[in-house]
Amino acid sequence: MGKNKQSESSKRWLKEHFDDKYVIKAKKQGLRSRAVFKLEEIQAKDGLIKPGMTVVDLGAAPGGWSQYAVKQVGDNGHVIACDILSMDPLPGVDFLMGDFREEAVLDALLNKIGGKNVDVVMSDMAPNMTGNDTADQAKSMYLVELSLDMCRQVLKKNGSYTVKVFMGEGFDQFFNEVKNAFKVVKTRKPDSSRARSREVYLVATGFKL
């Protein structure tokens, strides 16, 4: 019975995925994922990424956000990406594969970044979901805390940050933490984010150091 339910749920997800206009649009445009449209909407509203900037992309694979960011920063900019999963090379993107919770990987990433000279930290990280809402929420909040900690280590004064957060336990506390670290914090729900998803994006500007 459980398997049948799971199978029906998987079929529904696959149908929804392949009928999704953003999935179709991403394929037509040669983009790596539909997630790029979320960043594109954030960029249209908030203009976080500018030519010549240095951007760090956490949880980058398969590379949709990095693919978009590298076009925005141009030849004089720099995109540094990190993910536990492998990612096909992208021109202009400096990719490090590994789990930055591990000290050696974190050190290698910080070495690539080279100090507090980052203009934008962005994170579309999400844990592998188990279906246990309490455990999944705790894991997702742990990841967003890690991305905020990365901001504290690498962002320059007045730098910016955008991060995917799932509404639920711990959200309000995290929102307040971000508010304490940045001058302005906004919550965005891009049109390309599925309506039934609890995900939202925090967009924070004016890092206080």
Swiss-Prot record:
Residues that, per the record, bind S-adenosyl-L-methionine = 63, 65, 83, 99, 124
InterPro entries linked to this entry = RNA_methyltr_RlmE (IPR050082), RNA_MeTrfase_FtsJ_dom (IPR002877), rRNA-MeTfrase_E (IPR015507), SAM-dependent_MTases_sf (IPR029063)
State the organism of origin.
Pseudoalteromonas atlantica (strain T6c / ATCC BAA-1087)
Output the Gene Ontology cellular-component terms: cytoplasm
Function, in words: Specifically methylates the uridine in position 2552 of 23S rRNA at the 2'-O position of the ribose in the fully assembled 50S ribosomal subunit.
rRNA processing listed as a keyword: yes
Give the protein's recorded name. Answer: Ribosomal RNA large subunit methyltransferase E
Give the record's keywords alphabetically.
Answer: Cytoplasm, Methyltransferase, rRNA processing, S-adenosyl-L-methionine, Transferase
Supply the EC number(s): 2.1.1.166
The record's subcellular location field reads:
Cytoplasm
- Report the Gene3D superfamilies cross-referenced here: Vaccinia Virus protein VP39 (3.40.50.150)
Q: Which residues form the active site?
A: 164 (proton acceptor)
User: What Pfam families does the record tag this protein with?
Assistant: FtsJ
The family line of this record is:
Belongs to the class I-like SAM-binding methyltransferase superfamily. RNA methyltransferase RlmE family.
What reaction does this catalyse?
A: uridine(2552) in 23S rRNA + S-adenosyl-L-methionine = 2'-O-methyluridine(2552) in 23S rRNA + S-adenosyl-L-homocysteine + H(+)
Instruction: Cite the source lineage.
Output: Bacteria, Pseudomonadati, Pseudomonadota, Gammaproteobacteria, Alteromonadales
Report if keyword Transferase is assigned: yes
What GO molecular functions are on record for this protein?
A: rRNA (uridine-2'-O-)-methyltransferase activity
